[in-house]
Amino acid sequence: MSGNTLGKLFTVTTFGESHGPALGCIVDGCPPGLALCETDIQIDLDRRRPGKSRHTTQRREPDQVQILSGVFEGKTTGTPIGLLIENVDQRSRDYDKIKEQIRPGHADYTYLQKYGLRDYRGGGRSSARETAMRVAAGAIAKKYLAERHGVKIRGYLAQLGPIRAERFDWEIVEKNPFFCPDPDKISELEAYMDALRKEGDSIGARINVVATGVPPGLGEPVFDRLDADLAHALMSINAVKGVEIGVGFAAVTQKGTDHRDPLTPEGFLSNHAGGVLGGISTGQDILASIALKPTSSLRLPERTINCRGESAEVVTTGRHDPCVGIRATPIAEAMAALVLMDHLLRHRAQNMDVQPSLPSIPAYPGGGG
């Protein structure tokens, strides 16, 4: 299996399976001298960690990260950073009854078609459990971007099923299990998820990510456009079926006079482009949005086939998230951070001596909500 590495200068390679002994990753290309300890990484891992509320999977993984290399006396050395998280709450017996069945909506069918075998225990490598290492690596990128360049990356739940956030308060996001910015929607979300759990069904969600303080000039103008790499990274998250940058698909109904972002000496007057023009950052907030499908692991029966291609019925009895979007906010933040970190280092390597004659102008003040 190839395709386990992201990035060109700041690279992240992950390994491990849902029910294996551990998950791990190698972060290469981190500049030396960054103060780093396990606590710096654990903060984001705890935000993603399963089993924290009744609305997520009850698999209880502490996700305690270990730094194996690349840090000496509390600072990065510039050598590869090895990270490890042990799996401690696997319950593989939950999957014994379905090991011969192909779960609809999962990677069972495609893995068997591609590799001729699959790890039926929780999906193996295709499980969202793998994203723990993305969050761990992303925490390093977020710390560097914030401390060295003033870049802040935050996300929130914009919509869960039919429930949309209508008010916006960053202070509320970290104070509820949904990462929802609208205090008036929390009780509605809780009631909706309680009813959904009783039904045994699942639901999709939308997560928005905002990166502020991104300098202009990041991104390459053709195949490695900043927005293209962001879309690639965000689309690689399990269950993501759609990505938007800026207003995204709403641009279809906008006229050019509505969509273009006017410039004045005092700053931009809008940010429909989401902080990227021509594949290069403008200095405005980077705005990205992802749509996550409802999980297909349900205790409701569904038609399928078995490993011999015969008709069968499947009921999944393992522990699963009824809405994967509830825990996706720190994952989306991490993927955005990894892309921005990589492009910042690439820009510095090629363009550090460039002195633009054109002055930078301020970002549109309403571009991050």
Curated annotation (Swiss-Prot):
FMN binds at residues 125-127, 238-239, 278, 293-297, 319. Transmembrane segments: none annotated. Pathway: Metabolic intermediate biosynthesis; chorismate biosynthesis; chorismate from D-erythrose 4-phosphate and phosphoenolpyruvate: step 7/7. Keywords: Amino-acid biosynthesis, Aromatic amino acid biosynthesis, FAD, Flavoprotein, FMN, Lyase, NADP. Its cofactor is FMNH2. GO terms for biological process: amino acid biosynthetic process; aromatic amino acid family biosynthetic process; chorismate biosynthetic process. NADP(+) binds at residues 48, 54. The keyword NADP applies. Its EC number is 4.2.3.5. The keyword Lipid metabolism does not apply. It catalyses: 5-O-(1-carboxyvinyl)-3-phosphoshikimate = chorismate + phosphate. One of its GO terms (cellular component) is cytosol. Reduced FMN (FMNH(2)). GO terms for molecular function: chorismate synthase activity; FMN binding. PANTHER family: CHORISMATE SYNTHASE. This reaction introduces a second double bond into the aromatic ring system. Belongs to the chorismate synthase family. Homotetramer. This is Chorismate synthase. It comes from Nitrosococcus oceani (strain ATCC 19707 / BCRC 17464 / JCM 30415 / NCIMB 11848 / C-107).
